[in-house]
């Protein structure tokens, strides 16, 4: 069986649809074979991307080295439907097309968080720090959050856990609406900017996520940037709001962020990126769902596992530094089987 590769001109066409990582935050450490796997492309096609202007450096041994986030954006914007980021988004958003009740019903998950140590997928499980190896720390589930119940695993007494973990967790969603006009105003400001393409929804490097106002001013945002910005604006309006971060659960776990706001004593979730993606639909390779987009303003979903963070901080660290995006390849979840 052969794997169809993306057409070279299609990959090249993605280059003017996103903004590459600023030089001061870019990490040029992804080689051509890794890039080719992520893009389902031949090495020669990756070389053409470099020739066409995709930023890179040339290592005397490894050859051209790219920024992984730039590659993810090439994959997301090429429109082939075959690349790793396209397939991942399509799979993880598939539940938006499911019946409304399925978004909220209690759902039991078996979760494994064992971050990949390399872009090729070497897992952190069982690895100990020392002897020159990376020290891996991960954020644990927030068991105090509404709708989160630990069934097996733990204890998770500290916010950070050495190496990885496994757990069984029940997530229960909740359908909520929002009435406060201040919330609606801040929400519209963020979502409308994405919908009007004044700000491009794309992968953003972690150092730029930490400087979310700069990212927004540059005209780029992902879930972390949008959620932090939304939380800032809600707090400025006098509301209690926090940017949350955790995992969107599916065959593999995806790092995701959203905003939590308190209205009438009830914690309500605001997910501007989910709302945007569900609105544009086929443009991003997922089902268009106005009903799901509307539910993103207030409702809590049973596929989002919040972790213990103060303001959507990174979920995985290598040697005390935020891990690259490819570390998420070692995070997985599946529905728990009944005993």
Predicted features and spans:
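Short alpha-helical "recognition helix" segments of helix-turn-helix
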Residues: 34-37
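Residues that mark the N-terminal boundary/hinge immediately upstream of a DNA-recognition element
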Residues: 31-32, 67
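Short helix-start
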Residues: 56-79
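Conserved beta-strand edge residues that scaffold enzyme active sites
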Residues: 63, 247-248
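Cysteine-centered nucleophilic/redox motifs
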Residues: 216-244, 259
């Amino acid at each position: 069986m052969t794997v169809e590769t993306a057409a070279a001109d299609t990959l090249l066409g993605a280059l003017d649809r996103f903004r590459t990582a600023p030089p001061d935050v870019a990490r040029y450490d992804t080689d051509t074979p890794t890039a080719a796997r992520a893009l389902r492309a031949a090495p020669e096609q990756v070389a053409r991307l470099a020739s066409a202007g995709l930023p890179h450096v040339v290592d005397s041994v490894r050859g051209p080295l790219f920024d992984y986030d730039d590659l993810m954006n090439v994959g997301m914007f090429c429109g082939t439907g075959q690349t790793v980021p396209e397939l991942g988004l399509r799979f993880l958003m598939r539940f938006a097309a499911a019946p409304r009740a399925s978004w909220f019903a209690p759902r039991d998950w078996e979760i494994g968080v064992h971050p990949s140590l390399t872009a090729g997928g070497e897992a952190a499980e069982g690895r100990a720090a020392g002897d020159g190896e990376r020290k891996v720390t991960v954020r644990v589930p927030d068991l105090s959050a509404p709708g989160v119940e630990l069934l097996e695993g733990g204890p998770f007494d500290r916010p950070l856990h050495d190496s990885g973990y496994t757990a069984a967790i029940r997530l229960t969603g909740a359908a909520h609406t929002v009435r406060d006009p201040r919330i609606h105003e801040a929400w519209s400001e963020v979502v409308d900017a994405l919908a009007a393409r004044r700000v491009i929804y794309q992968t953003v490097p972690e150092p730029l996520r930490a400087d979310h106002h700069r990212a927004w001013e540059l005209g780029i945002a992902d879930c972390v940037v949008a959620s932090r910005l939304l939380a800032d604006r809600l707090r400025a309006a006098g509301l209690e709001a926090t940017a949350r971060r955790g995992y969107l659960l599916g065959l593999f776990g995806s790092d995701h962020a959203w905003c939590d706001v308190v209205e009438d004593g009830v914690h309500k979730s605001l997910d501007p990126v989910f709302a945007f993606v569900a609105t544009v639909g086929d443009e991003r390779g997922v089902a268009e769902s106005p009903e799901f987009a509307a539910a993103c303003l207030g409702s809590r979903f049973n596929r989002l596992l919040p972790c213990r963070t103060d303001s959507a901080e990174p979920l995985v660290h290598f040697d005390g530094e935020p891990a690259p995006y490819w570390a998420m390849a070692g995070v997985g979840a599946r529905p728990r089987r009944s005993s």
